């Protein structure tokens, strides 16, 4: 494939189709536009707050000036999705695959927490921008010593991405729900006692009887604990998979 045949969004993220211009260097760059859009989304904690008009206003330029660099808001969101995640921290030297993937997942979580709106960006394709590809490469590299086939490494990493993204999105949604109606969470155990007939919902009734929902601690602490629990559970499965299929397991 020639570079001119690359998908438009890929070419955009890699800056492969910027129009050369004669004369003085323009006062506005594509990086300026993306940075301003990220700042707006961060300030409002809302991806929907980003518009070409608001970005132009923030930069002190006309909306038409932005369109010389980026054709649409959709293109701008593509650029934001790669720029906001930045590059991953270097992997510590000499770590085993499990420690490495734990480090990687924790860093993905930290990166998304810096830009909570990031969790709302639709995932419509494989990682193709320079920053997202760097994260993908880092996770794949951790699996090098496992003896897994290359295709299996991709499966492990994609499963981990699915877990992290799903857990983050659910945690953010639940946190928003808690802020709106904390009583629904605090009274959940009492509510279940009233509606969950043990004959119809025996497993739920056992949870209620055990007092699992009686105490509601810090929502953020519980979310962190849930993330770590699910992550290690997933990695337990990866360990069993490596032992089963890899000579180096």
Per-region residue spans from a language model:
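Hydrophobic alpha-helical connector segments
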Residues: 89-134, 150-153, 157-160
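N-terminal intrinsically disordered/low-complexity leader segments
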Residues: 1-28, 202-211, 246-249
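Hydrophobic alpha-helical bundle segments that form small-molecule/ligand-binding pockets
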Residues: 135-157, 161-190, 238-241
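Amphipathic alpha-helical interaction segments
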Residues: 32, 54, 75, 103, ...
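Short, flexible active-site recognition loops that position polar ligands and cofactors
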Residues: 216-228
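Helix-turn-helix
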Residues: 32, 36, 40-75
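Amphipathic C-terminal alpha-helical segment
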Residues: 162-176, 194-219, 236-244
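Alpha-helical structural segments
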Residues: 32-39, 75-90, 103-107, 134, ...
């Amino acid at each position: 494939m020639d570079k001119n045949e690359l998908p438009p969004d890929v070419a955009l993220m890699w800056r492969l189709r910027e129009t050369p211009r004669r004369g003085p260097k323009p006062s506005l760059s594509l990086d300026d536009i993306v940075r301003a859009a990220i700042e707006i989304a961060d300030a409002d904690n809302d991806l929907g707050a980003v518009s070409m008009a608001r970005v132009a206003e923030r930069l002190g330029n006309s909306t038409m000036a932005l369109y010389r660099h980026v054709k649409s808001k959709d293109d701008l969101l593509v650029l934001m999705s790669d720029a906001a995640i930045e590059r991953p921290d270097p992997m510590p030297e000499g770590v085993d695959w499990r420690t490495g993937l734990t480090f990687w997942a924790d860093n993905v979580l930290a990166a998304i927490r810096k830009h909570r709106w990031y969790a709302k960006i639709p995932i419509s394709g494989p990682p193709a921008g320079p920053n997202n590809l760097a994260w993908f490469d880092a996770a794949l590299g951790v699996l090098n010593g496992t003896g897994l086939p290359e295709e299996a490494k991709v499966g492990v990493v994609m499963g981990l991405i699915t877990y992290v993204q799903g857990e983050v999105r659910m945690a953010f949604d639940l946190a928003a729900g808690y802020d709106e109606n904390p009583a629904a969470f605090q009274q959940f155990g009492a509510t279940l006692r009233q509606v969950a007939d043990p004959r119809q919902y025996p497993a739920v009734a056992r949870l209620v009887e055990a007092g699992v929902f009686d105490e509601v601690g810090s929502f953020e602490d519980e979310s962190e604990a849930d993330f770590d629990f699910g992550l290690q559970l997933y990695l337990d499965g990866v360990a069993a998979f490596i032992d089963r299929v890899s000579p180096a397991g």
